[in-house]
Amino acid sequence: MSYYIRQSVLTIIWLIVALLLVMSLISYSANDPSWSHINSAVNEVSNLAGTGGAWLADILYAFLGAASWWLIVIACYEAWNVWRHDVEPNGLLRFLGYIFLIIATAGLTGVLSFGWLAQGMIGQIVGNGLSSLLTYWGTLLFLLVFIAITVTFTFDLHWHEILSGQAIRSRLQAEAADDDEANTKLKA
């Protein structure tokens, strides 16, 4: 299979995953039959992704809460990453970063007590555990800094470029240079 076809297929797969997650999470209803409750009185599932989407959304909200929405961002980022030529093959580190980011975000929503749907079980465990060690404000500060650091390394952000307005320009220039190099290799 050619490199271009492989990239296209991977991009489509990641975007389909993102779309299914959006459909599942946005149309979540506690009335749908799912993992945490069975409702035989409902003849029609209201989740846009069907019964599977109702189950998926219920499991994600039960365990991760609002941090489940990071999965959509991650799927879109991975779809974009497929086309980047400057990405180092550090998939395992990026995967660990995703996990830490989701757990820290769940913990943050647990500390902020946005409710059961927002924090999930993991958020409640992490938030309560850290609050008993660091107090409320210490936990809040720790998780915010941890999330910022995790986002920086996981998504390969350079804050100096972002704050100075150079991020988009330098990314576009790097992509153009990579495309020129790839086109030169194809012609040769």
Regions found by a protein language model. Give the residues of each.
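Alpha-helical transmembrane segments used as membrane anchors
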Residues: 1-188
